[in-house]
């Protein structure tokens, strides 16, 4: 019954008035490739549908490309909030759910790009938020575009700094800081997947989603006054997803007096430079074939800022 790219969310039950209080939990599964499905798991076997509940087919709207829904014409989406445009979700695959405050955030691989002036790609993670693990949902937008979106040289429009292919990932809070985990495709080769992590800032108000409550997720910058980073261009396009950097968990900047693998470069203007490494115990990646006019960039190094590192 459970299909492609599944994830399971176990909801803790601590309300004595809840029918599942004695058991202490409810479990849900979410899955699907270009077709989103979800249901509550049978707690007696953890793989079938819980008796008395149903499979939620066409759970989130799936897209062919950004803004173009691929589900059959006339498909109804009872798991969406009233008035929510199905074309805003752009689901592709890789469902993953987290609880944030009093709300739930669904992360998935989805199509993005035209919403900030770039071509459509499924190299992005998107998110939706709701009051329960089964919604109803509102689209939150892009969480991270693994192509590394930045303004171009003169700031007239946004551009990309990595090659495109699909991604998978989710959110996790560590020592009070939220991070998005995802992967990018060195050389644009889908079977070569480099794990990535970036900090994000999450704002969640206490109102229910049905009453206008929201979850807002943007890139985190420890040095900005509002702790937010955005990529904005003169043409009016703005990307608010996580920033693709070389830092990993060193979010106050890399120590400039240490050695690092060339494979953590976050800006490359040519293909086929990053070389495969098939040694599971060697966490390095070589860059080769670099000639004149090649650009390879690393960001950021913490010159003078590491004394402020608290995370």
Regions found by a protein language model. Give the residues of each.
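Carbohydrate-active catalytic/glycan-binding domains of CAZyme proteins
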Residues: 1-308
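Extracellular ligand-binding interfaces
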Residues: 311
């Amino acid at each position: 019954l459970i299909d492609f790219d599944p994830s399971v969310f176990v909801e803790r039950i601590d309300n004595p008035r809840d029918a599942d209080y004695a058991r202490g939990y409810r479990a849900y599964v979410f899955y699907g490739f270009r077709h989103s499905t979800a249901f509550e798991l049978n707690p007696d076997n953890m793989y079938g549908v819980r008796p008395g509940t149903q499979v939620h087919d066409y759970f989130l709207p799936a897209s062919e490309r950004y803004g173009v829904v691929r589900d059959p014409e006339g498909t109804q989406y009872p798991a969406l909030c009233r008035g929510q445009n199905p074309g805003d979700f752009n689901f592709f695959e890789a469902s993953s759910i987290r609880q944030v405050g009093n709300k739930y955030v669904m992360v998935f691989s989805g199509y993005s790009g035209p919403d900030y002036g770039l071509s459509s790609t499924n190299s992005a993670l998107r998110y939706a938020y709701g009051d329960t693990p089964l919604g109803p949902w509102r689209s939150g937008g892009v969480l991270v575009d693994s192509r590394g979106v930045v303004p171009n040289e003169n700031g007239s429009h946004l551009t990309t700094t990595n090659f495109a292919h699909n991604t998978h990932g989710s959110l996790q809070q560590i020592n009070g800081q939220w991070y998005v985990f995802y992967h990018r495709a060195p050389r644009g080769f889908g079977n070569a997947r480099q794990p990535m992590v970036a900090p994000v800032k999450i704002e969640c108000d206490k109102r229910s989603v049905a009453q206008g409550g929201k979850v807002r997720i943007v890139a985190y910058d420890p040095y900005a006054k509002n702790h937010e980073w955005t990529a904005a261009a003169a043409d009016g396009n703005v990307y608010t997803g996580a920033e693709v950097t070389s830092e990993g968990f060193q979010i106050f900047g890399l120590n400039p007096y240490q050695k690092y693998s060339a494979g953590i470069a976050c800006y490359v203007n040519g293909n086929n430079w990053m070389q495969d490494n098939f040694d599971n115990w060697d966490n390095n990646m070589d860059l080769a074939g670099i000639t004149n006019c090649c650009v390879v960039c690393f960001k950021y190094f913490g010159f003078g800022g590491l004394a402020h590192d608290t995370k």
